[in-house]
Amino acid sequence: MINRATFVFTFSIFLAFTQLTFAQSKDVSSTLEVYKITTNQQGEETAEEVTTITRGDTLEYQVTYTNNLPNSISNLQPVLPIPTGIEYMANTAEPEINTASLSPSGSNFQQLPIMREETTESGLATENEVPAREYRRLRWSVPSLDSQNSVTVTARVQVIQANR
């Protein structure tokens, strides 16, 4: 189980990396919010502030990017790192992501679906889709963002390791 202070510190670091990915100044600001998603007795999803996380928890990242410039910007490409111990849950990104990376650093984003060649037990080479849980960074494409406007991107992840 991770306590709130450790969790907030860890995700603050990832938010800093996210901001550095596409903006080195205050031209675009970002705010990260993380919610634990649970289902109540009526089967309805609820989002609650994260205080602790445990293995198996579903979290939703909500990152809001704001254009602080006096004019619109184009081709904004927000990036969300997926920390170690966390797995991206397929098809939960809003708006839909168009590229992802299997590496926690660098700029090697690939169009989805990401494919890789694998060798079967009989020695045949096959091309298989990489499971979304292996994605280490997600990237969105925002064609334009008007001055003083914001866009929010979201993605859900599952905690697979919380014993830090």
Explain the meaning of each model-derived region:
Residues 8-18:
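Bacterial N-terminal signal peptides
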Residues 2-3, 22-164:
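Exported/extracytosolic protein signature
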Residues 1-9:
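Bacterial N-terminal signal peptides that target proteins for export
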